Curated annotation (Swiss-Prot):
<feature type="transmembrane region" description="Helical">
    <location>
        <begin position="126"/>
        <end position="146"/>
    </location>
</feature>
<protein>
    <recommendedName>
        <fullName>Golgi apparatus membrane protein TVP23</fullName>
    </recommendedName>
</protein>
<dbReference type="Pfam" id="PF05832">
    <property type="entry name" value="DUF846"/>
</dbReference>
<feature type="transmembrane region" description="Helical">
    <location>
        <begin position="101"/>
        <end position="121"/>
    </location>
</feature>
<comment type="function">
    <text>Golgi membrane protein involved in vesicular trafficking.</text>
</comment>
<comment type="similarity">
    <text>Belongs to the TVP23 family.</text>
</comment>
<dbReference type="GO" id="GO:0016192">
    <property type="term" value="P:vesicle-mediated transport"/>
</dbReference>
<keyword id="KW-0812">Transmembrane</keyword>
<dbReference type="InterPro" id="IPR008564">
    <property type="entry name" value="TVP23-like"/>
</dbReference>
<keyword id="KW-0472">Membrane</keyword>
<dbReference type="GO" id="GO:0009306">
    <property type="term" value="P:protein secretion"/>
</dbReference>
<feature type="transmembrane region" description="Helical">
    <location>
        <begin position="13"/>
        <end position="35"/>
    </location>
</feature>
<dbReference type="GO" id="GO:0000139">
    <property type="term" value="C:Golgi membrane"/>
</dbReference>
<keyword id="KW-0333">Golgi apparatus</keyword>
<feature type="transmembrane region" description="Helical">
    <location>
        <begin position="40"/>
        <end position="58"/>
    </location>
</feature>
<keyword id="KW-1133">Transmembrane helix</keyword>
Length: 180
C-alpha cells in the first residue's frame, strides 16, 4: 500500500493535508528556501508565518479533528496562567492513520528543529538560530500541551469508567433492589 493510499484512508483528509502542509512547509522553506532566493528576510518572514499557521492549525483544528484533543491557556482572576484541556467523547472513533501521523509529526518536528538549531550553531548562523528558536518554542509548546492533554483525557476516561461503574452498581443496589 502506498503512502498516498494510506493517507487517503484518513477520516479528515483536508485536516491531514493542511497539518502536513504547514508542518513540512515550514521545515522545507527553512532548509531549501535560500536555494531559490537570496533574500533572507523574505525566508525568515515566510517561515515565521508558516510556523504561526502550523501552531494555530495544530492547536485549534488538527488536534481536535485528528485525535479528539484540544487545549488552550486562560488567565485566572489572580493573574496566573491556567491550562485548559478538552477531550472528545471516549466512544468517538479515532482513525489510526490520523492518530499515527499526528503523533509522529507532533514529536518529530521539534526533534528536527532542534537538529537544525545545532547545525545553525555549528555554522555560526545566528540569525538562522533565532528563527529556529522560534520554531522550537512553538512546536515544543504544542507537543507539551498535547502530551498533557492526552494524559488528562486518559485519566478522565479511567475516572469516568470507575465512577460510572460505581454509580451504576449503587443505583442497581438501591433502586432496583427494592423492586426485586
Amino acid at each position: 500500500m502506498t503512502l498516498w493510499q494510506r493517507l487517503s484512508e484518513s477520516s479528515h483528509p483536508v485536516a491531514l493535508v493542511f497539518f502536513l502542509a504547514f508542518r513540512l512547509g515550514a521545515l522545507f522553506t527553512y532548509m531549501f528556501g535560500l536555494l531559490f532566493t537570496d533574500k533572507f528576510v523574505l525566508m525568515f518572514v515566510l517561515v515565521v508565518l508558516l510556523l504561526a499557521a502550523d501552531f494555530w492549525n495544530v492547536k485549534n483544528i488538527a488536534g481536535r479533528l485528528m485525535v479528539g484533543l484540544r487545549w488552550w491557556n486562560e488567565a485566572s482572576e489572580t493573574g496566573e496562567s491556567v491550562w485548559v484541556f478538552e477531550t472528545a467523547d471516549p466512544q468517538r472513533y479515532i482513525n489510526p492513520i490520523d492518530s499515527k501521523v499526528f503523533w509522529m509529526m507532533l514529536y518529530g518536528a521539534p526533534v528536527l528543529w532542534v537538529c537544525l538549531a545545532v547545525l545553525a550553531l555549528l555554522k555560526f548562523q545566528f540569525l538562522s538560530l533565532i528563527l529556529v528558536f522560534i520554531a522550537v518554542s512553538l512546536t515544543v509548546t504544542n507537543a507539551m500541551a498535547y502530551s498533557r492533554c492526552d494524559k488528562f483525557g486518559k485519566a478522565n476516561n479511567i475516572v469516568g469508567q470507575v465512577s460510572g461503574g460505581l454509580l451504576s452498581r449503587a443505583a442497581r443496589g438501591t433502586f432496583l433492589g427494592r423492586f426485586m
